[in-house]
Amino acid sequence: MPRRADRTVTTARAMTPINWWVAEPARFARDRAEVAARFPALTWTSDGAGGWEGRLPMWPLDRPEPPGLADVLGGTGLEVVIAYRQAYPMVPPRIYPVDPRPEAVECTQHRWHVNGDGSLCQFQTDTVWDPRDSICGLFVKAAAWRVEYALMKAGVLNQMSLHGIVSDSAADHLITTASEKSDSGRDAVAPKIAGSAG
């Protein structure tokens, strides 16, 4: 059968890739508006698949800040690089803590909730992410990770909670405990990690 002259074959090489925000302009506008309203210290970057950089607030949770939080966190929230992936919003972005940056050994142990590449473990599986969810929910979880990380470093928490502290206030009293421990002149010491030197 002869080939019709009006048929064209598009090869992968002939296709020009576009960024997710070109394919999803409404989602891009929504993310930018929500982040500007809730996390104004973050700056958008269009490098790669885009993302945000900056410092998260110490306590963006929907309950009162526990006494001693500023002492435990050294007066600053988590500095992050948030890297979207081109499949966003079908897949969540990766959140990389910059300050404080987890130690290499902490990226190999589940109890720190850090992946091997240094990004935060946000979900038990990526299928928990709902593409309709606000991106700000992930930023709140990252800020809360910073609190649990400080509590572990202070030795008042042995491992991070399974579901995080965003919706669970059970560990809030530990913030005051860690602050009082620091105020009493005792140095905050990271819990001994089995099999590590030192």
What are the language-model segments listed below?
Residues 1-77, 87-198:
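UBC/E2-like fold recognition across ubiquitin and ubiquitin-like conjugation systems
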